[in-house]
Amino acid sequence: MTGFRDQLGVHAQALVLRETRNNLLTSNIANAATPHYKARDIDFGAELARASGNGTLRTTEARHFAAGGPAARGEALYRDPVTPSLDGNTVEMAVEQMEFAENTLRYQTSLALLNRRISGLMTAIKGE
C-alpha cells in the first residue's frame, strides 16, 4: 500500500520549488536598479531530484569529484550576466522576465496535474 504523498508524485514538490524560484525571480526583477545586486536562481532539476530523494550521487571510482557545491546543498546560485552592467548589478531584465514567465507556466501546469491527481483520488475514495 502506498502513502498519500506517493500518490501525488513529484507535482507537490515541484509546486514548492516553483514557488521558491518565483520568489527569487521576482526579487531579481525588483532589484534590477539596485547597484551591486547579484541575480539569483536555483537549479530546478537538481533541487527536484534532491527533494524527491533521487539526488544522491553515487561514485563508482575513487577519483570522482565529491558532490558538495551550493546546488547540492539547496542554496540559491548567482547568475552570470551575458552583458555585465557598470554598477555591478547582474540582473538582465529580459532574461528574468523570460524565466519568470516560463516558471509561472510550469507552476500552473504542475498545479493542474496535481488537481487532476487529487480529483482522481477523491473519486476513488467516494467509490464513484
Curated annotation (Swiss-Prot):
<dbReference type="InterPro" id="IPR006300">
    <property type="entry name" value="FlgB"/>
</dbReference>
<dbReference type="InterPro" id="IPR019776">
    <property type="entry name" value="Flagellar_basal_body_rod_CS"/>
</dbReference>
<protein>
    <recommendedName>
        <fullName>Flagellar basal body rod protein FlgB</fullName>
    </recommendedName>
</protein>
<comment type="subunit">
    <text>The basal body constitutes a major portion of the flagellar organelle and consists of a number of rings mounted on a central rod. In Gram-negative bacteria, at least four rings, L, P, S and M are present, whereas Gram-positive bacteria lack the L and P rings. The rod consists of about 26 subunits of FlgG in the distal portion, and FlgB, FlgC and FlgF build up the proximal portion of the rod with about 6 subunits each.</text>
</comment>
<comment type="function">
    <text>Structural component of flagellum, the bacterial motility apparatus. Part of the rod structure of flagellar basal body.</text>
</comment>
<dbReference type="GO" id="GO:0030694">
    <property type="term" value="C:bacterial-type flagellum basal body, rod"/>
</dbReference>
<comment type="similarity">
    <text>Belongs to the flagella basal body rod proteins family.</text>
</comment>
<dbReference type="GO" id="GO:0071978">
    <property type="term" value="P:bacterial-type flagellum-dependent swarming motility"/>
</dbReference>
<keyword id="KW-0975">Bacterial flagellum</keyword>
